[in-house]
């Protein structure tokens, strides 16, 4: 009776917890639902009439059914409950959800020694329905079902039954149908719900691709690849991948690959491609919306891929379809020709109508006419231009070597990118008459061993315009020196010449208008005296001896002077006593040496009016204030260029103002392709601003972290070469940067790297208390050479050390040098001889160069000129970059890839992925079934690719980290 009461009590209390089931992910297709059948299924019990029993209860005026069994007082129970035959259909893997309660064995008298608290779940596949024919041997055990919670006596008293929900899956199934069976071996169980279903990945529209409803696969670790179909008017972009997604076993879509884009003439509207409206166009398959037809185009029809130009307007072949149609420019404005002796200077102003383009160039042609005959012809071959006469961008040119008494006509044509599409020309002409004298006709009148007498003549009509003649002469073969004599007559004697020597002589008339045409260059030779052969030998020997004595004296003087200089230098200065100091290079001038910093700003920078500058958005914050992206009007006012704008914050101190202007005074002295370019300053208005060129990709360290693994080794070495070239330029100007790091390198859209940030304070040189402090914060210990940290000795050699750290940052895609070590630990490690290990996939030659930069003795480090030369050789011979340096992932990936903060293995996969900065792949690992560290350490390289890690750099980072992870797991004894 007590057992019957227990079963009845279960029937009354089971519904209190039934509503706790969670919705399954994906789409579920139900094959069997006991609770929904309302007791009409009529399952088979064995033995019949014993064990399992169908019970009914009324709850909320609705009948509720369950199968229960509670033969706990009798031993050797073997009670079976079998479902009806279930048709499998298209299912490959089925999921079985059970809701049940189990009573605590201790709630029965004497503890019921034969009582159990579990039951077994079985299944059997078959192609036929066997009806009531029940054979145990056909069934295969799925699992022993144990409750998470059991119902104890106090739960009965409180009318609270603890409901358990368990789910199991079976697959792959191959027969037409199947049975489920439940075996009781002596428990008090109430089976409230049995739901059997399989999962599908639902129909999906994503990335303009349609993915059909797909049955989830039967193999849990694998993902079923499903090809998508582009929607109407969408295509796979050239070079792109066909759209694919992966259907996981739980019915979830994972790992999307590829995409579709709306074709030319169509734009994306929600999940479809819609034709461009009239007046709009789209010229290629892309994610961009349709664009409005630009200026000077005709209205386009619906779905247009381009907009036709209006009559008289054109589009050059290289012009994008989004650019307005343009036309050839008008003629140059205000052409003038000013004669200056045998030269003419042509000047003009730009066309009043540029045609809507900025690529205006000019061509100059010349025609000469003889006054006597009136004949004219081209004269390009006989005149000389100050620069090539075609493709000029300036608005002036000088034409020389013009002939006297000749009329010249010069034509200046303006052209732009569409001028070649029309036959008409836009030009202006100017004529000028040359009244310059004819070249003098020179002849030799006499000569001796030490002199030459020459005379000349010009036509009588021109003699009245000449006020003097200029005679230029020099030894043949000597291009370094010459002599000039001026005279009012028509002859001259050149004295004090060397015997038996050939001289080059030219005569030129000087008029009020300037120099006239020069005569031909004549060769005249002095006479050889008697015995000139012996004298020449003796003279040559004497001259040679004298020269040797002079050179010896000069060499001795230089040696003594250098020796004295070295004696005055400290041992640390040996590096700077190289010959490069003797080169006549431009030298950097420290703006802080000026009593008034405004003087340095005026000398080295360009003042810009605030009206020429527009601030658009904040892109960062510097030491002195905010940094903006903005636009700067060019001097012509017709064009704007993007710039970066540093501002001086309100409430600045006088020292901050001096430092702010000092940085501008430094930048203004530099002009190099790999140094950030200063456009100008605003120092006369508030807020004060420093305007530099705009670098689209920002700081190098952040850029590399965002593009991890996307560049080839050759591209990375090219970036390093650019940085080294900029530093070579600074070193040649005797400028020491002191803060060279990837964060202070800016990258433009063409991947050109430029050195920036010249604001590091000078306090280090003057204040012995400021060992680790600048006006902007701490000294960058991780990038700074040991001698600079210890003795505040900043030199070009310490910049070379910093460049080695930058090389390491670039090759590791922006990793933090020395990882999480403290500054004190970094300094100690360096002094103990530790150097950063080789990065992953780093060429041996590059790592060797890093190690040279990190020589403890700074005199042994290479100069930047040497570094540029080495990198140039590597770039010219890419095969030399294929030999990789030895790589130990246990040292080189120092991110905590094998242990957590307490030195123990990671508890979760997501925690491990986050530690190696690969957390973006967490869902990929989870979807593929790698939910625990024990499973992850068994992965192969193919497994990493299969879950959707596509970038080679990311694949290697994960693979190398797994090596260390396996070692750690094996060390602590976690079973795998």
Curated annotation (Swiss-Prot):
<feature type="modified residue" description="Phosphotyrosine; by autocatalysis">
    <location>
        <position position="735"/>
    </location>
</feature>
<keyword id="KW-0221">Differentiation</keyword>
<dbReference type="GO" id="GO:0004714">
    <property type="term" value="F:transmembrane receptor protein tyrosine kinase activity"/>
</dbReference>
<keyword id="KW-0832">Ubl conjugation</keyword>
<dbReference type="GO" id="GO:0007169">
    <property type="term" value="P:cell surface receptor protein tyrosine kinase signaling pathway"/>
</dbReference>
<dbReference type="GO" id="GO:0001649">
    <property type="term" value="P:osteoblast differentiation"/>
</dbReference>
<feature type="region of interest" description="Mediates interaction with ARHGEF16 and ELMO2">
    <location>
        <begin position="606"/>
        <end position="906"/>
    </location>
</feature>
<dbReference type="InterPro" id="IPR001245">
    <property type="entry name" value="Ser-Thr/Tyr_kinase_cat_dom"/>
</dbReference>
<comment type="subunit">
    <text>(Microbial infection) Interacts with human herpes virus 8/HHV-8 glycoprotein L/gL and glycoprotein H/gH heterodimer; this interaction triggers EPHA2 phosphorylation and endocytosis, allowing virus entry.</text>
</comment>
<comment type="similarity">
    <text>Belongs to the protein kinase superfamily. Tyr protein kinase family. Ephrin receptor subfamily.</text>
</comment>
<feature type="topological domain" description="Cytoplasmic">
    <location>
        <begin position="559"/>
        <end position="976"/>
    </location>
</feature>
<feature type="domain" description="Fibronectin type-III 2">
    <location>
        <begin position="438"/>
        <end position="529"/>
    </location>
</feature>
<dbReference type="GO" id="GO:0032587">
    <property type="term" value="C:ruffle membrane"/>
</dbReference>
<dbReference type="GO" id="GO:0048870">
    <property type="term" value="P:cell motility"/>
</dbReference>
<feature type="modified residue" description="Phosphotyrosine">
    <location>
        <position position="930"/>
    </location>
</feature>
<dbReference type="GO" id="GO:0009986">
    <property type="term" value="C:cell surface"/>
</dbReference>
<dbReference type="InterPro" id="IPR001660">
    <property type="entry name" value="SAM"/>
</dbReference>
<dbReference type="GO" id="GO:0001570">
    <property type="term" value="P:vasculogenesis"/>
</dbReference>
<dbReference type="InterPro" id="IPR011009">
    <property type="entry name" value="Kinase-like_dom_sf"/>
</dbReference>
<dbReference type="GO" id="GO:0016477">
    <property type="term" value="P:cell migration"/>
</dbReference>
<dbReference type="GO" id="GO:0031258">
    <property type="term" value="C:lamellipodium membrane"/>
</dbReference>
<keyword id="KW-0898">Cataract</keyword>
<dbReference type="GO" id="GO:0048013">
    <property type="term" value="P:ephrin receptor signaling pathway"/>
</dbReference>
<dbReference type="InterPro" id="IPR020635">
    <property type="entry name" value="Tyr_kinase_cat_dom"/>
</dbReference>
<comment type="function">
    <text>(Microbial infection) Acts as a receptor for hepatitis C virus (HCV) in hepatocytes and facilitates its cell entry. Mediates HCV entry by promoting the formation of the CD81-CLDN1 receptor complexes that are essential for HCV entry and by enhancing membrane fusion of cells expressing HCV envelope glycoproteins.</text>
</comment>
<dbReference type="InterPro" id="IPR016257">
    <property type="entry name" value="Tyr_kinase_ephrin_rcpt"/>
</dbReference>
<dbReference type="InterPro" id="IPR036116">
    <property type="entry name" value="FN3_sf"/>
</dbReference>
<dbReference type="GO" id="GO:0030027">
    <property type="term" value="C:lamellipodium"/>
</dbReference>
<dbReference type="InterPro" id="IPR013783">
    <property type="entry name" value="Ig-like_fold"/>
</dbReference>
<keyword id="KW-0675">Receptor</keyword>
<feature type="modified residue" description="Phosphotyrosine">
    <location>
        <position position="594"/>
    </location>
</feature>
<dbReference type="GO" id="GO:0030335">
    <property type="term" value="P:positive regulation of cell migration"/>
</dbReference>
<dbReference type="Pfam" id="PF14575">
    <property type="entry name" value="EphA2_TM"/>
</dbReference>
<dbReference type="GO" id="GO:0019838">
    <property type="term" value="F:growth factor binding"/>
</dbReference>
<keyword id="KW-1183">Host cell receptor for virus entry</keyword>
<dbReference type="GO" id="GO:0072659">
    <property type="term" value="P:protein localization to plasma membrane"/>
</dbReference>
<dbReference type="InterPro" id="IPR000719">
    <property type="entry name" value="Prot_kinase_dom"/>
</dbReference>
<dbReference type="GO" id="GO:0070848">
    <property type="term" value="P:response to growth factor"/>
</dbReference>
<dbReference type="GO" id="GO:0030316">
    <property type="term" value="P:osteoclast differentiation"/>
</dbReference>
<keyword id="KW-0053">Apoptosis</keyword>
<keyword id="KW-0812">Transmembrane</keyword>
<protein>
    <recommendedName>
        <fullName>Ephrin type-A receptor 2</fullName>
        <ecNumber>2.7.10.1</ecNumber>
    </recommendedName>
</protein>
